[in-house]
Swiss-Prot record:
The modification N5-methylglutamine is found at Q107. GO terms for molecular function: DNA binding; protein heterodimerization activity; structural constituent of chromatin. This is Histone H2A. The nucleosome is a histone octamer containing two molecules each of H2A, H2B, H3 and H4 assembled in one H3-H4 heterotetramer and two H2A-H2B heterodimers. The octamer wraps approximately 147 bp of DNA. In contrast to vertebrates and insects, its C-terminus is not monoubiquitinated. It comes from Botryotinia fuckeliana (strain B05.10) (Noble rot fungus). The [ST]-Q motif constitutes a recognition sequence for kinases from the PI3/PI4-kinase family. Core component of nucleosome which plays a central role in DNA double strand break (DSB) repair. Nucleosomes wrap and compact DNA into chromatin, limiting DNA accessibility to the cellular machineries which require DNA as a template. Histones thereby play a central role in transcription regulation, DNA repair, DNA replication and chromosomal stability. DNA accessibility is regulated via a complex set of post-translational modifications of histones, also called histone code, and nucleosome remodeling. A motif ([ST]-Q motif) lies at residues 133-134. Gene3D superfamilies: Histone, subunit A. Signal peptide: none annotated. It holds the Pfam family Histone_H2A_C. The modification Phosphoserine is found at S133.
Length: 136
């Protein structure tokens, strides 16, 4: 009997390794999310589908925020997204603002807002361009 590895095993095991992220069509790492779920003591056991679903949700949220932040950067004629653009994107979107309402973004600033009572009053003019009469 010769030593070494036998040639037995399953037939046709020449498949290339494929990550769970690529199987799911995701850019976010499913394996890392699974490891963090296991080490985080959220539950005794973690199902196989849970990290895939969570990675997909995180990828969607990141894509949504980056899309809106990119639009904010383009509106400000910039090509690089800065924290200010993230702040504007999140605070101008109703659902993201609700989700991240208590989150502070460093160097994000605040939304420009002037209270209606502080704005100058509109003067009422007639169609002829003359000021409205004070007569009753």
């Amino acid at each position: 009997m010769t030593g070494g590895k036998s040639a037995g095993g399953k037939a046709g095991t020449t498949k290339n390794a494929q990550s769970r992220s690529s199987k799911a069509g995701l850019a976010f790492p499913v394996g890392r999310v699974h490891r963090l779920l296991r080490k985080g003591n959220y539950a005794q056991r973690v199902g196989a589908g849970a990290p895939v679903y969570l990675a997909a949700v995180l990828e969607y949220l990141a894509a949504e925020i980056l899309e809106l932040a990119g639009n904010a950067a383009r509106d400000n004629k910039k090509t690089r997204i800065i924290p200010r653009h993230l702040q504007l994107a999140i605070r101008n979107d109703e659902e993201l603002n609700k989700l991240l309402g208590h989150v502070t973004i460093a160097q994000g600033g605040v939304l420009p807002n002037i209270h209606q009572n502080l704005l100058p009053k509109k003067t009422a003019k007639t169609a002829g361009g003359k000021p409205a009469s004070q007569e009753l």
